[in-house]
Amino acid sequence: MDPELEAFIPLFPRTDLADPVAARGRFSELAAAVPVPDTTDLDVEDRTVPADPAVPVRIYRPRRADPVKRGQAALVWLHGGGFVMGDLDTEHPWATLIANGSGVTVISVGYRLAPEHPFPAALDDAYAVLRWTAEHAAALGIDPERIAVGGHSAGGGLAAGVALRARDERGPAIRFQLLNQPGLDDRQETWSARNFTDTPWFNRDKARAAWRHYLGSAPATPYAAPARAEDLSALPPAYIATAELCPNRDEDLIYAQRLLQAGVSVELHQWPGTFHGSQAIVSAEVSQRQNAELGAALRRALAG
């Protein structure tokens, strides 16, 4: 493990998802300890997207972005938290980092959480925000031809599911997928999913519990677990980042390979010495490189 990251391991609480309410409290405490990047160059606004039910979003607009007549590029961003934890506040540091690093308008989505709201609630919320963003692009100052979806962990899996659904339903055009350590496969059969039993923060048992909460009694579909999709053709280009010590690692590597075989352009980065979510340790040099690359990949993909 990267020495700078290893020094922080004792500070990470050992948590499980047996009690979702308690897990959310611990997750909020951990997120509150993450330094919030400077928002001086951002206009931050809370909005509500009309849907059934309404979906809260937080919009981050970089002030320094060069004005473009047809509007700014945008990212619909979905937070991590195993489908069970997280909200607009816990995601504030990440969304701020991405907006500052990319110069792109970031729309952070406060989707409904499992187990109270199992699949497809979170996916429906995410898709509703994508449609709203595209339909109201002019009012939002956004270029409808430069909209990306992305997310971390469970949010990365949601973003991949949104891309599949948009393709199948001929929904809004998605320019790019930004998938950071995404949760893609409920079957948990890969080597990393089976063997990473004691990795920091996120391990085999926690991953399995997250999927149980999210799916409930319903069978998994490709929209819930994108690795189950048989056809990955005609999807948006993707950037996929994996962490070496992460149960999701191998399913992410396999998904990237399958996208390539389906004719989808993919940029893949496997970060050695890192673990799931270790980018939150922003003082570490490797975390700074990871976060900078997320912004740079998005900036390249959405360039006018």
Name the predicted role of every residue range.
Residues M1-P62, Q288, L302-G304:
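A glycine/proline-hinged amphipathic helix-loop "lid/cap" segment
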Residues D89-S108:
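Short amphipathic alpha-helix adjacent to the substrate-entry channel of hydrolases
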Residues H117-A139, L294:
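Alpha/beta-hydrolase active-site loop
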Residues A134-V149, E169:
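Gly/Ser-rich "nucleophile elbow"/oxyanion-hole loop immediately N-terminal to the catalytic nucleophile
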Residues G151, G155, A159:
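Gly/Ala-rich beta-loop-alpha elbow adjacent to hydrolase catalytic centers
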Residues L164-A218:
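Hydrolase active-site cap/lid region
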Residues I240-T242:
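Short beta-strand/loop motif that positions the catalytic acidic residue
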Residues S283-G304:
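Catalytic active-site module of serine/aspartate enzymes centered on a nucleophile-bearing elbow/loop
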